[in-house]
A protein has these predicted regions:
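Bacterial N-terminal signal peptides that target proteins for export
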Residues: 1-6
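Bacterial N-terminal signal peptides
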Residues: 7-16
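Mobile cap/lid helix-loop segments that border enzyme active or cofactor-binding sites
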Residues: 22-110, 232
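Alpha-helical scaffold segments that form or flank carboxylate-/histidine-based iron centers
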Residues: 76-82, 112-126, 199-204
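Mid-length scaffold segments of soluble, non-membrane domains
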Residues: 115-153
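A contiguous pocket-lining binding segment that forms or flanks enzyme active sites
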Residues: 145-172
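Acidic/histidine-rich alpha-helical segments that form the ligand environment
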Residues: 163-204
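Acidic, carboxylate-rich catalytic segments that either coordinate divalent cations
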Residues: 191-192, 208, 216-233
């Protein structure tokens, strides 16, 4: 029953996406369908057999792609492409990841964007997740992290002269990832910066979700975009 409901809801979103883009769920040749086809065709498969032929997708997979393209992310490359082979898992994950990815927007994670990106980069470095790093290092600078901070994380050294808020989140993330716990002192410092327990839970959620993301691209050995050199070699 749950699988049936997921397919039914997904097909409804698929039809709504086509309609919103100027077509209908049963109408071929629309700009929306062309975008879906191009998105799938441009996926770069690694070791997991990510489908790149739109006509070979089943109903769940088409609904999964349409759901992502109609949401705030609008892109299905990297770990979300890997999870196309398990679209029910992918759909649940991409919705949770969107909540974390777009921190600071209404209805999304309460963690300030630059601190959210700080944690994401630290998780990406932990896993040497090239694809995650490529997707986030420049965005992290746009959100307010100093380029020197980003470079220090890439090199695996503690950034120097961190502002108080970044220092608290760096210490919490580092300690939690290394020891799988956090001292009261470290937790309380991060809690103060994030304004309470919701911020802490949102931050740990981001750390967990981006470990999933990093694990997926590590499993797949997802290629970087053409022309992009590896970051961790």
């Amino acid at each position: 029953m749950r699988r049936y409901l997921m397919v039914a809801c997904g097909l409804a979103m698929f039809g709504a996406y086509l309609g919103a883009q100027g077509g209908s769920g049963d109408q071929k040749g629309t700009p929306a369908e062309a975008r879906l086809r191009a998105t799938v065709a441009n996926l770069r498969a690694g070791r997991i057999a990510t489908p790149t032929d739109y006509d070979r997708l089943n109903a769940e997979q088409k609904a999964y792609v349409a759901s992502i393209l109609s949401g705030p992310r609008g892109d299905i490359s990297g770990p979300l492409g890997v999870m196309m082979v398990s679209p029910a898992l992918g759909d649940l994950t991409q919705k949770a990841m969107a909540y974390s990815r777009f921190a600071g927007r209404e209805g999304f994670s309460s963690v300030p964007p630059k601190l959210n990106e700080l944690a994401i980069l630290m998780v990406g470095k932990l896993w040497s997740a090239e694809y995650v790093w490529n997707a986030h290092h420049a965005y992290a600078v746009r959100m307010g992290l100093a380029p020197e901070t980003v470079e220090a994380i890439r090199r695996g050294v503690r950034p120097a002269d961190l502002p108080k808020d970044e220092q608290a989140i760096y210490d919490f993330t580092d300690e939690f990832l290394r020891t799988h716990t956090a001292s009261d002192r470290t937790l309380n410092a991060a809690r103060d910066v994030l304004g309470g327990d919701r911020g802490i839970v949102d931050l740990v959620g981001t750390m967990g979700l981006y470990q999933i993301s990093s694990m997926m691209v590590a499993l797949d050995k997802t290629p970087l975009p053409q022309g992009v050199k590896p970051y961790f070699q």
